Amino acid sequence: MSAPQDGEAGFVLLSVLAIFIVVGAVLAAAILQVRSATGLAQARADAVRLQGAADGIARLVAYELDLGRVYRRPGPGLPEDGTVTACPLAPGRTALLSLQDQGLLVDLNATPRPAMEEAFRLLGIPDREVLALAAEIVDYRDPDDVPEPNGGAELPQYRARLLPWGPRNAPFASIDEVDRLPSMTPAIAARLRPVLTVYNQGGRFDLAALVRRANPAAIRSLPGSAGPVPSPRQAFRLSVVVEEGRSRAGRSAILDLGGSGFVVWQQTVAPDLVAGTGHPACAAVAASLAAGP
């Protein structure tokens, strides 16, 4: 073969190789795209299944609580003080549940100031902050513009603290609003949040039970008059997280057994549900999901 023919053959070979490289790159990109789409679809399907399980568990617990109230029979048996329960489901899948009776908590709208002050002291809040916070809570929720004695705060006091907002002068809509109080700090808020609610309409609570759970070291400081106060067991905060591998889905709800049903139904993974202990009630939870995905 002559030199020109050799050169032409070499050029053709290089052209064919270039085409193969381009086609291979396109195919590789397409395969990666398909795999990525498949993985994304699988992740979405897993998330939907986990969310369905979380929602089903939340509705099951609510149903059992409602039956217990109507027919005066035992409910699901889960702890009602916010303790986290861990329930094994299918292999590799776990449900974390937390049930909190709101009638055991300090109500920002209904609990009288003296009762709030007593509870806050026993929870370890310094006396000066106790007086200010209790007064600010009352001023935030009451309709008038007259500051409470010993630390109250109406609009002028908020302005003096360089805060761009003032008191609502109406009931707290959620416990998150305590962050707006002039004397509230992140450390105090973290200590108080677990014992606060806006769903204990009667305002009364069992001080001894509250302190025993939130600050056991202060049990000996309880006043002799701190007798048991039964909860009306009407409102509950219910949080469920279902996890499998690295995937997690959750549901948080407020259940009113007085006839309103779910007054809050939020798709969220509660940050405090990361570990828990087993409980006999888990058997019923697992059985209810046995036929599910």
Regions found by a protein language model. Give the residues of each.
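Compositionally biased linear targeting/interaction segments
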Residues: 2, 9-293
